């Protein structure tokens, strides 16, 4: 906020409190350094920072990387909830199929040097070896409950 706005310190502090609590952190987490936070708390603090300027679009790069399955599922739910309540567009790079299923309405994949964007249901209809292996292979079965 300091770098991109001319808001008063008091107003910046209030915005920080709102964003920190919005992502499920206690207010006092806003006063801590990253090294003083757990991995999951750091992810949430980063998300609060990304939301500080009220963007319409949020870009996330492997948002659940390094989180345990419970923490990853909770973070997925948080992203989906914020996406819906704030009307956010979330552009996400991930290899986590559980996150894809939990968060994404549309998915983009690179196939034969072409980008294909569609819903998961439509992507699964594509008769392409990579699509079938990636979304129906052994690692995908757990995510899809197959």
Question: Predicted segments — roles?
Answer:
Residues 54:
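Conserved catalytic motifs of ABC-family nucleotide-binding domains
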Residues 33-37, 41:
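Conserved ABC ATPase signature
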Residues 73-86:
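Helical segment within the ABC ATPase nucleotide-binding domain
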Residues 94-95:
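H-loop/switch region of ABC-family ATPase nucleotide-binding domains
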Residues 9-28:
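Conserved ABC ATPase "signature" region
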Residues 100-102:
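A short, surface-exposed alpha-helical micro-motif characterized by mixed small hydrophobic
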Residues 58-61:
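Catalytic Walker B motif of ABC-type/P-loop ATPase nucleotide-binding domains
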């Amino acid at each position: 906020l300091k770098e991109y706005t001319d808001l008063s310190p008091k107003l910046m502090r209030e915005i920080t409190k709102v964003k920190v609590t919005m992502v499920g952190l206690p207010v006092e987490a806003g006063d801590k350094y990253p090294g003083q936070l757990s991995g999951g708390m750091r992810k949430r603090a980063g998300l609060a920072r990304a939301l500080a300027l009220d963007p319409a679009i949020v870009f996330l790069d492997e948002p659940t990387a390094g989180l345990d399955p419970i923490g990853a599922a909770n973070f997925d739910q948080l992203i989906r909830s914020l996406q819906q309540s704030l009307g956010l567009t979330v552009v996400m790079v991930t290899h986590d199929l559980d996150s894809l299923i939990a968060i994404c309405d549309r998915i983009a994949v690179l196939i034969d040097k072409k980008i294909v964007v569609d819903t998961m249901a439509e992507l699964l209809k594509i008769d392409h070896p990579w699509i079938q292996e990636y979304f129906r292979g052994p690692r995908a079965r757990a995510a899809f409950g197959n």
